[in-house]
């Protein structure tokens, strides 16, 4: 969607979740939206790289009453806890931030993690800007952008509706080795391959998987979850 179209939608009072380049998000008016930076998208034609002038717009159902907020890295226990008893939460967190690391490692242990549905994504930057530009998230109600913390839309639904989360994954587990990890971390040294302690980097290289094009597909409560190598 063009910036003009997105701005018109914002001014209409619509509640939105947005994604796009930082320059595009900076140009939008204040309103009922949250956003994160990223130039990479999938549309009907396939993969798209948008570096300026357009944003990806996801409307939040009008039947829901939304509360938009930013939680600092020291407030993350409230992200799930403050979610509505009947509804869902949309969350966006900057890649590599303290909030990203903490939420990824600890959110699953929240008592409400499987009772209050939370969906979202990790904001990023163009690969050519890695190390030069930081991922951002935006709280549209104030017009602020942040390098850390999580922006959310807590969406309460009427009693006649129920939120259910499903995951669409184009990858499936193979029938090869089973890998298990004893530590929860973004960085891994050794893991267990079919029960035997093995250096992950050496294993990946020996299997010819160091091109990074295929993920590890894990089982999380019955759902197939990808972990990039």
Q: What residue ranges belong to the model's regions?
A:
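Small-residue-enriched flexible segments
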Residues: 1-23, 29-32, 38-41, 47-88, ...
């Amino acid at each position: 969607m063009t910036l003009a179209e997105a701005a018109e939608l914002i001014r209409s009072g619509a509640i939105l979740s947005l994604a796009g380049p930082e320059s595009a998000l900076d140009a939008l008016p204040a309103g009922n939206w949250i956003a994160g930076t990223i130039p990479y998208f999938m549309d009907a034609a396939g993969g798209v790289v948008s570096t300026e002038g357009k944003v990806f717009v996801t409307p939040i159902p009008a039947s829901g009453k939304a509360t938009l907020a930013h939680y600092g890295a020291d407030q993350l226990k409230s992200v799930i806890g403050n979610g509505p008893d009947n509804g869902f939460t949309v969350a966006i967190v900057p890649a590599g931030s303290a909030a990203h690391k903490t939420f990824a490692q600890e959110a699953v242990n929240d008592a409400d993690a499987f009772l209050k549905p939370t969906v979202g994504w990790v904001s990023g930057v163009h690969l050519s800007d890695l190390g030069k530009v930081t991922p951002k998230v935006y709280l549209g109600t104030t017009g602020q952008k942040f390098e850390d913390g999580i922006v959310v839309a807590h969406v309460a639904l009427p009693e006649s509706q129920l939120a259910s989360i499903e995951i669409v994954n184009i990858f499936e587990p193979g029938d090869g080795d089973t890998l298990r990890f004893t530590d929860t971390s973004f960085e891994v040294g050794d893991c267990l391959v079919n029960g035997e302690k093995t250096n992950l980097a050496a294993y990946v290289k020996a299997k010819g998987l160091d091109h990074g094009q295929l993920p590890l597909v894990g089982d999380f409560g019955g759902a197939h979850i990808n972990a990039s190598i």
